[in-house]
């Protein structure tokens, strides 16, 4: 056992001076080192806060840009839809015009063909009339044995033509 005390404590004067030295060291650290550390921590905190603010600004700008790009993309899609719709309308109108022109051309061709057929039929009828008239004149000259005058020729021709037209008209309706 130690003669200085019950709990074997070291010399109290030594403890006292250790505590005083520790407090002086703390005071010196607080006075000279702590402000430097505090300033460095505050600077670092300010830098971090500034970086966070800049990151938030950048994020906000990125969101705005993203929204702007989305609006532009949607506008471009709308414009593309309008262009496609207009192209479809124009193609449909062009097809309709082509159909109408083809229909009109077909009608014109049919009309020209009908007119040509009518002209050919009229020419054929005139030719038939002329030949019939010639045959009637020859036949009547032989039957009568004499030449007919112009009025008699005209009368016989008209009778033959009326007979022929009646037969042709009867053939058309049958």
Swiss-Prot record:
The keyword Lyase does not apply. The chain crosses the membrane at residues 9-29. It is found in: Cell membrane. One of its GO terms (cellular component) is proton-transporting ATP synthase complex. The keyword Transmembrane applies. InterPro entries: ATP_synth_B-like_membr_sf, ATP_synth_b/b'su_bac/chlpt, ATP_synth_F0_bsu_bac, ATP_synthase_B_chain. It is a single-pass membrane protein. Its main location: membrane. Keywords: ATP synthesis, Cell membrane, CF(0), Hydrogen ion transport, Ion transport, Membrane, Transmembrane, Transmembrane helix, Transport. Pfam families: ATP-synt_B. SUPFAM superfamilies: F1F0 ATP synthase subunit B, membrane domain. One of its GO terms (molecular function) is proton-transporting ATPase activity, rotational mechanism. NCBIfam families: ATP_synt_b (TIGR01144). F-type ATPases have 2 components, F(1) - the catalytic core - and F(0) - the membrane proton channel. F(1) has five subunits: alpha(3), beta(3), gamma(1), delta(1), epsilon(1). F(0) has three main subunits: a(1), b(2) and c(10-14). The alpha and beta chains form an alternating ring which encloses part of the gamma chain. F(1) is attached to F(0) by a central stalk formed by the gamma and epsilon chains, while a peripheral stalk is formed by the delta and b chains. Belongs to the ATPase B chain family. F(1)F(0) ATP synthase produces ATP from ADP in the presence of a proton or sodium gradient. F-type ATPases consist of two structural domains, F(1) containing the extramembraneous catalytic core and F(0) containing the membrane proton channel, linked together by a central stalk and a peripheral stalk. During catalysis, ATP synthesis in the catalytic domain of F(1) is coupled via a rotary mechanism of the central stalk subunits to proton translocation. Component of the F(0) channel, it forms part of the peripheral stalk, linking F(1) to F(0). This is ATP synthase subunit b.
